[in-house]
Amino acid sequence: MKSRRDKLKIPSLTLDLSPNNQSPTLLSPCSPCSPNSPLQTLHPWSCRSSNRKSLVVGSPSPTLSRPLSPLSVPTAGSSPLDSPRNFSTSASVNFPFARSHGPRADRADGRRWSLASLPSSGYGTNTPSSTLSSSSSSQERLHQLPFQPTADELHFLSKHFRSTESVTDDDGRRSPCMRPRSRSLSPGRASSNFDNEIIMMNHVYKERFPKATAQMEERLQDIITHFCPSQTLPLADGVLGFIHHQIIELARDCLDKSKGALITSRYFLELQEKLEKMLQDAHNRSESEEVMFINHLARKLLMVIARPGRLLECLEFDPEQFYHLLEAAEGQAKVGQGIKTDIPRYIISQLGLTKDPLEEIVQLDHYDTESSLQLDQEDYHDPYIPSTPSRKKPCESDFETIKLISNGAYGAVYLVRHKETRQRFAMKKINKQNLILRNQIHQVFVERDILTFAENPFVVSMFCSFETRRHLCMVMEYVEGGDCATLLKNMGPLPVDMSRMYFAETVLALEYLHNYGIVHRDLKPDNLLITSLGHIKLTDFGLSKVGLMNMTTNLYEGHIEKDTREFLDKQVCGTPEYIAPEVILRQGYGKPVDWWAMGIILYEFLVGCVPFFGDTPEELFGQVISDDIIWPGGEEALPADSQDLITRLLRQNSLERLGTGGAQEVKQHTFFLSLDWNGLLRQKAEFVPQLEADDDTSYFDTRSERYHHLASEEDEETNDDESSVEIRQFSSCSHRFSKVYSSSEHLATQLNLSFSSTERSHSDEKEEHGDRWERTLSTEEEKNRLGAETRLRSWTSSGSSHHSWLSERSASPNVLTSTCSLDTMPRFAFSSEEESSDHKPERPTFTLGEIKGTPPKPTSLCDIVSLSRTRLRSNSTGAKNSTPRPLEAGVSRRLRGHRETPEKQSSSTGSRVPKSASVSALSLIITSDDFGSGSLASPISPRSLSSNPSSRDSSPSRESSVAVSSLRPPIIIHSSGKKYGFTLRAIRVYMGESDVYTVHHMVWNVEDGSPAHEAGLRAGDLITHVNGESVLGLVHMDVVELLLKSGSKVSLRTTPLENTSIKIGPARKNSCKGRMARRTKKSRKRENQDRKRSLFKKISKQSTVLQTSRSFSSGLHQSLSSSESLPASPTHSLSPGPITPSRSPAPDAAGDAVSPQSTSPCSSTPSSPAGHIRPSSLQCLTPKLSGQRYKVGRRKSTSSIPPSPLACTPSPVPQQPSSPQRSPSPLLPSHPRSGHCGLQGKTLSPPTIVRQSSRNRATEAPRSPLLKRVQSVEKMAAYLSSGRKASPVDIQHWEDTVDALEAMSESRNRDWGAEKHERDTEVVVMRRLNLSERRDSFKKQEAVQEVSFDEPDAGAVELVPEDKKTARCSGLWERLPHQTSWIQARTGISTPVTTEQETSCRLVPQIAVQTSESDEQEKSQGVWECQGFYPLQLSGKDKCPLVTLLSEPTGATSDRSQLKSEKISECPAPFALSSKRDSKKN
């Protein structure tokens, strides 16, 4: 008997009832659990009284066995009860298709269901939030396994388990056997099993309620017929258009499932949740009146499924399971392990019966009253009608076209600027006639809807759309970095890490799109744009299809197979190299086609070309269908994990293809094992584009040779009435764009009211501050009349709709305008203007429009107070002291920035470099010349404005600094108790690559509701000051001491960690050897004095433009630098950003070339010292300086250093003196102060792997978009032979240059050999030894190859014939491991010639390539050799004395003295480079 209790063995069934498994034992038949089995281990079936009828348990037959469980609601977690077993039929002998709850055929697998995972919601139909529906009819009679089954019962059970035939119960009814409960998704099981069970349940449902099913299907068909987007006029609002499409898709899917008898109550529940989410999106993201249409349509669909849903829920109710819950609760209460409260109260709460029924009636009455009031006031205010219905729609006249970005098959994309806001956008113009002829009108509406609806940092977003006479225009965010196809063309194959990041970000974009049912159908590198931070944005949805959004009830294999053939239009579209086999074979397709294209893209990233190619599409398609992938071998072989990923993505069968089951399959691949999917935007990209100007589109290929679209506007003969009514609906405004142009007058009124109400309580505090503000304004009005626009911006990205931001942008003509980014389109636009004579300081007024008269400076100290619950934070792109200020309601924080003298303010105005508005999207932009600072931010932070890395946000090529003392007003924390509510942590911040570190402190955690949280402190903030005292460099004990001395009130000044240059990286292996750079405590006044004293000391020593740069790194590839121009300069230039000081300024051709005036921070003219601040061509060759124990001269993170004209091969292009030159040489004789004398001691920058060569804008053949700016040697030679005489200014210019070079050479600590070549003036071109042959095997580098990631191997020099020098102008930026300098390598041939005339000329010194100490020790890492010399003949007075830069001190003195005494020409001769480590010293 004991063995029977322990193991009840039945043929084809094994019941393990041993206590070790903590299952219910037979020792306690009336209790669901034994004393040793806690509640969380209970099994959902229990033994009841033995007088019940024998239980008919499930059949193990193949047709009724357990299938895959697809039905898991997102809120249900991973509980076994989330599987769809609860929606199956009940198995009782008195009810057809009833399901059982006894021992199951699969008990042998040891699965234990946990009662603790049961949802807390009840089983009643009065709880709409219930995620659990029962599995049985409410009319069934419950059955149970016998306590001790007899032989007859065993025979009956075994016969039942072995057969699929029905059994007859005591009442004579036929009862079919049912399958056991379904469980979680597992491979290898039949996909039809689950469908069979649901079909039987639906059969019961249709038998019981035949009219309900027929009525639902009829109404669903009616909705689809009358409201289908193809049958109705498209909605003008893109978001609503997309939601409209999704609602119809949901109705169509419900109809298909009903006809296929696959309906469950859980499906209805999820359908209701999807509809509610769509309605919420419609109300939150649209202000159109068409919201009412979406609201009506969604409610209509909800009413259709309401009755069937209730009936199914009742039909699936499982009283046995309910009884089991009661017994389990009772047993658990007896044991005392869980429920301590009243058992009936617990059960009632589980049933959802705790609500007061009268409360709902009161709420309904209240709702009726509110509804009547709203109806009465409908004429005056409709909640669904925007507050400004008369707002002007966008039109083409609102934008001015700057230039063409690129051409496509359907239209062209132009860079445009909004005339009012001066923000840049990309405008896609599609010819309407072409659309009509190709019947593509509906498709362009789909593209508009997708772009408008999408809110994802990896998807390009649209701001507005409109139609003209000949075009449909879509205004999108401008992503400046070009596309990945151009990058591949110029670089060749990408390194694995770079490919992994690009691919991973595209996976996230694809996952987002697929969740909303969007199939891109045209994925390719051309449609992957690169943001200014080097991240990816997916664009071009012109061929996309919108299907059904993801539903968790559709995850079983049967539906997955249906999803792979979601579209049966038999249309072959896309780019041939990326089209999936099922599309070619016209078998129907779905989301897996995008994963096929992703496999092609990854292969192309890593190899450099696509795996399948052919001369014709037919040949290409034949390879796609039949051929295998050819993998590169040898040194070019791909890593095993990447090859495996590509192989799985390129499976011919779409069901076997990785990604078909969801993006999670791809994300879990070993190729991404080390990838942080949540921190992709925080990663520093290896390639960061560098923009030369506000309108720089040089990273894009215009493709004018392939496509040509008329840019002129329409014929006057064309009539607007000719456009169809459908096309007229194309004009729309997205949520993020419409906020800018909403009724600002109305908002300004509300703003003033809010200011007055919040400031009255602080009037006494602000009176003194306001007077000072007024006096400051009166002083500044006379000094500077530059207009300022103060715009209240709103961060409209998801999850941050309650935050608004104040952004001040300078309207100075010397300052770059802003551009828009994805999530940070300004919601309201205001400009600050002084009020009338009775103006009060604490009440600034905001009005719309440009400033006229004498507006206050944007740097004025005005008080900004909170607007109700709105948190304000400055996104200054030009304001001196506009600081971020997190404000709570009714609390105003004073701006505490240092005031400048008027002279310094005027100079700082000209040197501000405001970026695009997408910079404001991600970071705080501060250009504070007190500290020579800009800003730098990382995409993600609680304080950063957006996770969108678009349009030049915090581009490292802009000015940046860690001078955080003016970044944010102090956060004052008032603590009434013993704690402030935040956790402090000290971090080591290493100086560059060295072992020297400083201690910084960051906020590790902030408790919700604590005083620190209420004051605005957030986790991840770097603490810079405590009670006004700087804590940068203080040890942890000192900082804690400062906090403890504060008492109940502490003032903290913080900045987001990603707004600094601190990189986050792994712990250093040799951290024990680190040396902390301790800093003594000084008062702020003393620090300022010391800073000024050292600054003047440096200025007095050097007669050059002061450049300081410093970077801290502890691993986030961020760097920062600052630059200041001398007050004596005629105009203060716009610094291009991080600048690497140079030993040898580069010569530039055409000194008389006229460069157009530009507001670019990187473009300069001879009349501006901006060119002198620009790093010259050889700035990448920075030496080591004395007293430096760690690497220096490592290139700042992608500063805009132009390539040297010396590094390019001769070009047959004739000289064009009038062509604009972006980078005049710092040695041009325009200004006396032009030499470079950087403070090398502070150049501690992390390396960046990419170097972009900007290009000339002259009208050249579009052979290579990345080489247009490179100067040709012929231009230089022609200029050198032009016979121009030197002027006294030129002589002074050269003398100052020599002085600067003297100061630099005296500070060095390395012996730099200066070999004197017995040759004429030469241009030496360097080439890295033994380049990979992969670069030559793929024809993808017609232009500059910006990065070479080949392993450095010693080998022979590859010589290029003379006749090929002009053809191969592709420079390779090579970097050795641990190398501190960046060298541009070009191919050329060595032509050494020595003449008597050459020996009589001053000789060119050789500048040795400066490398780190580790490089000198590891010479096997790579060898640099001089490969080509390009002689430039000089004669007579045209000879240029050549500067001896790096000779020995003994010889350098005499050489320099001779140099000073000579007359010199206007253009310096180019320098000869040599990097031989064993160069001889003279």
Curated annotation (Swiss-Prot):
Q: According to the UniProt record, where is the region Disordered?
A: 1-87, 116-143, 163-191, 755-810, 830-915, 936-965, 1061-1266, 1449-1482
Which residue ranges have biased composition labelled Polar residues? 75-87, 117-128, 904-915, 1242-1256
User: A GO BP term, please?
Assistant: cytoskeleton organization
- Keyword terms of this UniProt record: ATP-binding, Cytoplasm, Kinase, Magnesium, Nucleotide-binding, Phosphoprotein, Serine/threonine-protein kinase, Transferase
- Basic and acidic residues bias located where? 759-792
Q: What are the recorded GO MF terms, alphabetically?
A: ATP binding; magnesium ion binding; protein serine kinase activity; protein serine/threonine kinase activity
Supply the EC number(s).
2.7.11.1
Please name the top-level EC class of this enzyme.
transferase
- Where the record annotates domain Protein kinase, the positions are 399-672
GO cellular component entries: cytoplasm
Start and end residues of each AGC-kinase C-terminal domain = 673-745
Catalytic activity from the UniProt record: L-seryl-[protein] + ATP = O-phospho-L-seryl-[protein] + ADP + H(+); L-threonyl-[protein] + ATP = O-phospho-L-threonyl-[protein] + ADP + H(+)
Binding residues for ATP = I405, S406, N407, G408, A409, Y410, G411, A412, V413, K428
Could you say which cofactors this protein requires?
Answer: Mg(2+)
According to the entry, every stretch annotated as the PDZ domain falls at: 968-1058
The catalytic site is made up of D522 (proton acceptor)
- What is the protein's name according to its record? Microtubule-associated serine/threonine-protein kinase 3
Q: Which InterPro entries match?
A: AGC-kinase_C, Kinase-like_dom_sf, MAST, MAST_pre-PK_dom, MAST_pre-PK_dom_sf, PDZ, PDZ_6, PDZ_sf
Compositional bias per record (Low complexity), positions renumbered to this chain? 23-39, 59-74, 129-138, 175-187, 793-810, 866-877, 1109-1129, 1155-1169, 1218-1232
UniProt key word Lyase: no
- Say where the protein is mainly found: cytoplasm
The answer on whether this UniProt entry bears the keyword Ligase reads no
Q: Where is the composition biased (Basic residues)?
A: 1070-1085
Q: Where in the cell is it found?
A: Cytoplasm
